[in-house]
Amino acid sequence: MISMDSTPTLNFETSDNLDGLPDGSNAFKINIDDLEFGQEIGKGAYGKIFKGEYFGTPVAIKEISLQPNDVKYKDLTKFIQREVAMLRFSHPNLVQFIGVSERGSSLYIVTEFVQGGDLAYYLFRNKFDDTPEQYIHRKVNVGSSSTPDLSDPTVHNGEKLVQLAWPLRIKIAYDVACAMAYLHSRNVIHRDLKSTNLLVGDNWRIKVCDMGFARTAQVGGGSRAKRTMTICGTTNCMAPEVVLGQDYNEACDVFSYGIVLSEIITRMDTTNNLRPSSLKYGLDVDVLLPLVPKDCPPPFLKLVLDCTEYDPDNRPTFKEITERLKSLTKKLSTPHILPPLRVLAQSPLTSPIQSPISTKNQFNPNLFKSIVHNNHNHSSSSNNSSGYNNNSNHNINITVNSININSSNINNNNNNNNINNNNNNNNNISFSGRQEELMSPISMGDESDLDSDDEDDSYTSSASSSRCNSRNGKIINGGKQMGYIIKHHYSSDLESSPNGNNINNNNNNNNNNNNNNNNNNNNNNNSGNNGICINSLSLGVSSSPIQIGLSSKSPTPPSMSPPTSVKSYHPNNNNNNININNTNTNINNNKISSSPPVKNSPKSNRFSNGSLKQQFQQYQQQQQQLFLNINEDDKELEELSKSIDDTFRLHFSPLNISPTQNNNNNNNNSNNNNGNVNHNHHHLNQHSHINGHLISPTIISSSSTTSSSTSTPSLVSLTSSRDHHHHHISVTSSPTNIKPLSSSIASNSSVFTPLGSGLTRTVQS
């Protein structure tokens, strides 16, 4: 007979006395190298959430950064310790805890991966949609024959919603009640129960997650003893006693559960309209009842009203709730076909990485970022009684080795001095930039979730929330969210396509026959005089302008940084034109600006001409060659400047201006009246040869109006023609009172400035 004292007992001793047995103290510690990190699937209050694998098992990895110098370090440490401790509780309706890992200042909490995401994705139909006024308006009109039935869960702004039958909704409520009944049996208060902390697993099994705010209930103080605890949770789901800072117990979870049930029934998010401050944050039944569908089971609605009682003592326990739901389930048939679950993360996973660093698009700093403007060239022509008004444009045309100049450019029909100066010898270097749409590195989620105050650690209720993405954004290929699109132009995608002899304005001289009282009509068509043209891209408007002057040195290439603005080209607005080697460049306030493109360049395959690197090198070589040519032309301009200044001072004198009536020039034109002007016109003939080049001076009029006391030539027209290597210049002014040029300068009405004094010049080869 064996006495009771001799009965063998089990003694759980430490592993020091149990040789050969595995040590379970580090059972939850995970080596970071054993984790495979996938894509980011969510963002909580204290970190990001990634999908991953742990020895072939799909897991969710929550990354939390710990900074000892942070003021929230103490609270964050307590939050992590509490969540890890609560996750050790095991229940089919609780998210399974796998372990913890750390590296550096980051801590990683590993749990099971729940494929369906949070329940709020399937429930809400008015989130980010209704304003409070619209909410109340719909509340009043619910059930009216003239308004649509809001109980129909299939349509929401033309978007199909997941159909949830009432048996399935009751099953969801039952799963949550079972999990909470288990926690309360272990004297644990969740304190943050809400629909975004309920995850949908296989076969629509609900799992409660986010135990960071969990606390132990008062033990030994009787049934439902209250205690003073901090105010935490989500405002719309918190019990009134928690919001008001009163003592509370586990009954606060029952009130939050009742709010979740109301969302399951109405499929609408809880707003301040349901819980006004006038009712001390209790549930407004008058607002709730009109939102309840007509086919809602009455016992289910009664459970909502009981759980949301203002007095905590009048609320049922979760054990009572499970019994009521179980009896209700027996009366309803469970649907055989369940709604499909969404795919929270695509497979396969990426290759293992050392740490879950979020990969972002890295852009080459030498990118052209611009707004495409489809403007066209503008021709500047104005017919006034005083002739062509050029809006005080300072134009000095210096033609170097001029070619293709037709002597028929001057046609005097009906005694009208119609001068057409068609600058058709413009070699416009155009670059056709290939357009590519790149995803902006800007976050593609709804920004309202980033600044939310609900301290949400669920899988999808954050910046990358699939609920927000699919319902409020556009889905593109691969299930990715359509974010802000920025059109970038790679510098390597630019191809040089010079358009030689680009004739922008082909004005026939015969069209300039105007019988307007012998008005001097001057059509100075300089459209397209912008040497560097970028189709679909504006290069000239840059923050680093290129200064080109008489004694300017070699210009530096323009900045490759994105232009701050894109300006439209407006001729005749105090523009100074500089034409170099048949490459006309418009200068506005000493800054290179490009003219708007004539048309958009066609879209083509960006890899058609080789790799991006090779194309970028070709583009750099073209840029260098372009500015080398500009440097050579600038040196030539410096050599010409001195001779030009001397010639202007000697030959362009007021003494050379004299009234003539029938002054026949040596120009070989088909019209015999060439050079003939009326008695009220003044004509000037000047011949100047400098180093084999033809110099064409111009008088600049600073005022478009003619004063009676001063001599103000409103128009001086210059035309050059070639006849047996003899160069002729014909300058015609409008009828005015002739005074010495010095007096005109003194009166500031008509000023001629020598080229050496800083007047911008135009050179054309």
From Swiss-Prot:
EC class name: transferase
Chain segments annotated as transmembrane: none
Domain of life according to the entry: Eukaryota
Residues forming the catalytic site: 192 (proton acceptor)
Compositionally skewed regions (Acidic residues) per UniProt: 446-458
InterPro entries cross-referenced by the UniProt entry: Actin_reg-Ser/Thr_kinase, Kinase-like_dom_sf, Prot_kinase_dom, Protein_kinase_ATP_BS, Ser-Thr/Tyr_kinase_cat_dom, Ser/Thr_kinase_AS
Keywords carried by this UniProt record: ATP-binding, Kinase, Nucleotide-binding, Serine/threonine-protein kinase, Transferase
MF annotations from Gene Ontology: ATP binding; protein serine kinase activity; protein serine/threonine kinase activity
Domain Protein kinase: 35-328
Compositionally biased residues, Low complexity: 459-470, 499-527, 562-605, 662-678, 699-720
Residues that coordinate or bind ATP: 41-49, 62
Family to which the UniProt record says this protein belongs: Belongs to the protein kinase superfamily. TKL Ser/Thr protein kinase family.
Pfam families with a match to the protein in the record: PK_Tyr_Ser-Thr
Catalysis performed (reactions): L-seryl-[protein] + ATP = O-phospho-L-seryl-[protein] + ADP + H(+); L-threonyl-[protein] + ATP = O-phospho-L-threonyl-[protein] + ADP + H(+)
Annotated source species: Dictyostelium discoideum (Social amoeba)
Catalytic activity, EC: 2.7.11.1
Region annotation (Disordered) ranges: 371-393, 443-477, 491-527, 545-620, 654-684, 699-738, 746-765
The name this protein goes by in its record: Probable serine/threonine-protein kinase DDB_G0271402
Oxidoreductase keyword on record: no
